[in-house]
Amino acid sequence: MDTEYEQVNKPWNELYKEATLGNKLTVNVGMEDVEVPLLPSNFLTKVRVSLSGGYITVRRVRIKIIPLVSRKAGVSGKLYLRDISDTTGRKLHCTELLDLGKEIRLTMQHLDFSVSARSDVPIVFGFEDLVSPYLEGRELFSVSLRWQFGLSAQCYSLPPAKWKVMYQEDALKALKPSKIKKASKTDSSV
């Protein structure tokens, strides 16, 4: 299977401008990671898979966001995926407001649609409601995005899935002190 990733720099919807503020996207292509710069506006990532026929479903979506600024900077935003197979740019999935000053890893089992293998997979990835004290062009975070393709002879849809948080920096730090206290109490009673 020959997989090609390309970046297209043209507005898909003049009413909506994506603000990614000069960040980088790392896309896994086979065994190699390819780094693609995210532009301040009109960022559109498309995937083309060269196959003889059939339908593609995107499965096991994994996203890791690593901050490149101070935690106290107050950088936040919502991560979304959009379907641009029609002109409305229907929002497929959107997270809650994320604190982008802390590392976070998200996963989703699948996207709930399939498309012809002869066309581009119509997924737009980006951030909205992005709040940052920095000027445009400053790298705020790096994003790594990985997924697998599910192939089928027939077109079908899957039940809706939600983002799950695999890892969140502060959540793990909050658990560590309580585990240490419990361990020390049991040790002293022995």
Curated annotation (Swiss-Prot):
Annotated keywords: Host membrane, Membrane, RNA-binding, Transport, Viral movement protein
Record keyword rRNA processing present: no
UniProt GO MF annotations: RNA binding
Functional note: Transports viral genome to neighboring plant cells directly through plasmosdesmata, without any budding. The movement protein allows efficient cell to cell propagation, by bypassing the host cell wall barrier.
Family membership: Belongs to the tombusvirus/aureusvirus movement protein p22 family.
Residue ranges of the TM segments: none
Gene Ontology terms describing biological process: transport of virus in host, cell to cell
One GO CC term, this protein: viral capsid
Protein name: Movement protein
Main location: host cell
Localisation per UniProt entry: Host membrane
Organism of origin: Cucumber necrosis virus (CNV)
Keyword NADP: no
